[in-house]
Amino acid sequence: MNGTKRLISALSGLIICFQSCSTAVSDCQEHFIGTNFWYGPILASDGPGSDHERLSAELDSLKSIGITNLRVLAGADGEDGIAVKVRPALQTAPGVYNEDILKGIARFLNELEKRDMKAVIYLNNAWEWSGGYGTYLEWAGAGKCPDTRRDGYGKYIDFVSQFPVNEKAKELYWNHLRFIVERFKDSKAIYSWQIANEPRCFSSERTNQDAFVDFIWRSAALIRSIDPVHPVSTGTEGRMGSELDMRLFERLAECPDIDYLNIHIWPLNWSWIHRESVEEDLPAAIRETDRYIDEHAALARRLRKKIVIEEFGYPRDGFEFRKGSPTSARDAYYSHIFERLTESAEKGGELLGCNFWGWGGLAAQNPDHIWWEPGDDYCGDPSQEEQGLNSVYMADSSTIALIREANAKLAATVCLEFPEPESWLMCGTDRRCVKVDFFCAEDCTVKAGAAFVSDTSLMGAADTISYICKEVELKAGESRRVEFEADLEPGFYEFRISVGERDGQMRHRREFNIGIEPEKIVSPLSAKEDFDAFWEQSLRELAEVPMDCRMTLVPEYSTSRRNVYEVEFKSLGGATMGGIYAEPVQPGKYPAIIEYMGYGAEPFHYWGDDNPETVQLLVSVRNQGIFLDEGHWILRGLDSKENFYYRGAYCDAVRAIDFICSREKVDCERIVSKGESQGGAFCWISAALDHRVKAIAPAVPFMSDFEDYGDIVYWPVHEVLEEADRLEIAHDRIFDLLSYFDIKNFTSRVGCPVLMAFGLQDPTCPPHTNFAGYNMVRGEKEWYCAPLCGHGMWQESEWVKLREEFLQKHLND
């Protein structure tokens, strides 16, 4: 196949539609500040704990401060009378229900509907305070669940870690799920269904984690099959509830039946703050909170899903429990969360809403004890926690005022969304326009300005190629799409959107990259007359260096199917290189995959049972990977092309092929390579300087188009030029040197099939530089674009899948 095939990430932009019965109501841009009100259905019931008058007063109070989204427990499971568990229970035995609580759920939803309020209903609990995991295991015959107050959380966690692998316990839960969802699915007050409160695996064992992921996926699919109208979420805390493993959280989030992500944030529980220094530890709490939000927002962005921070809490000053006691630190913490939400709404970010924990409202406190006892009012703190620990009461005047003001500000905010990010890369007959959705909860008219800035001017004057200003009239609660169109030449541009504020000032909201006809970008070659001779001589010198290979078995990663080794061997100039090598145990000839590492990337070991019929080499070039030293490799040897670090490193990329071909079990007709960033550059080199590689898959390749590179971003070109100034080397000499290592000067030599990936938002190896090399390839080639991705293409599961399919195809040809 000649020419180019284009592949653009096929994930659709996020649209969450909340529907009521047969009438669809799109609330995809309705951001909210809500609360946790776990005991609402109990107040609405007819039995013990009921208080209809208080329920009405609480809902009216919540509505008065702008809260319309309530996260609630469907009901507790198991026997009553356990101190750490809320009562009365909804499900007293498998499939046996307390009719009073069932009526309470119905009445609660009806009262919400009257007030145009919504409920997120969670159906299970990993923790002891409503039965959940522990009760289902008891009913399944797994033994008696430990009492956390008497036996401690260690024993409790050991016990409930059985839940993901106990088929009978899960089936009992699924029966409950079917019953509740079927019974209440037609309520107009349902915001979404939630699988559980803080579902956890409680195990680092792979078998347990796989079973846990399967449990979440099957639960979500079951809810969807019963109620295809309302959204579904997991209820998980995020990384902290996923055995500190972001990949485990991602596996849950990838479920197609999970509509939005949840995270919880607990500075005290997670030891970001301490009881004796609640106020003093506030800066640390905010810092860690921002990190936590950011890492999960990055995942949500990749998956095109929104996030709700559905639990967060902060103690009172001095670690008091009394309602009305000072809450200066809590108020500051809440304010920060609310600001993060509003800022995200303004910029079209990933945060959809937040629910603080929890609502104490009008509850009275018993002055004689701090733990809940029968007859006490319910508050935001369940029975296993000190009453007043995290509750927000109407008597907490400063907090109530803060919530009211934050909701008012959110309602007046003009929110943006940026649909169809696939359209940000425009080719052929595609219209040259960017779509923006505007939304406000109130009627308003705003000015919107859009600028298109050439990427090659970003480090200089930031030339605006086109500027468009429009007046946008918005009706309360309705979204309006506006298109900004410009006549643009082939290239990449930064799109900047500004919105007029109520004071008349235009304020910048967001910027992102777009692309126009990238295959028509022209970046002239910069190779010098002796370019070919230089590399021919370098390869001759490399061939004269004995490999002197050493292999050390790594038993902990080796299996009966494949052995894993750490290897080292010699390259140009006698420098040591090597990496991690895996080959099948059984005799035979096997295909080989060479994987080149990024700049300063940490090495990892292959696992023996993964790809057992394939040879793999993770390449560590000189002074990197398993031979890592102090870094700054691109600054080494700037005095001459012969001494420049990348002369040796490029030869190392070729020497890796020499090593692979020296192995008896390698089929030298079936070798492919892959890599990202610096590794992507080495991929190009492996095919340009050596023709034993049958296909390559470079992603976000480094080291290309240095002339334009420095006009787009600071690193690495400006750092190199600063070092040149220190060494008193003229800039033109530096660019002459770099031309011998510029990937675009190599790629016309590539004769094998190529699949290149790039992140449209890459701030490290900008897409302009990727295409400078790609466009010089004359043979079979195709590219893949991840429109929301920056430099981390390894996180793009769709790309990883396509890459592996591409490489396997050419290994099997």
Which stretches of residues belong to each language-model region?
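Active-site mouth of glycoside hydrolases
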Residues: D27-W272, L282-K305, P315-A329, A345-L389, ...
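Gly/Ser-rich "nucleophile elbow"/oxyanion-hole loop immediately N-terminal to the catalytic nucleophile
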Residues: K185-I190, L635-S677
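C-terminal catalytic histidine-bearing segment of alpha/beta-hydrolase fold enzymes
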Residues: N355-G358, L362-I370, F771-D813
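N-terminal cap/lid segment of alpha/beta-hydrolase-fold proteins
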Residues: A543-Q586
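Short beta-strand element of the alpha/beta-hydrolase
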Residues: Y581-E583, K589-Y599
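Hydrolase active-site cap/lid region
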Residues: G680, W684-A730, C785
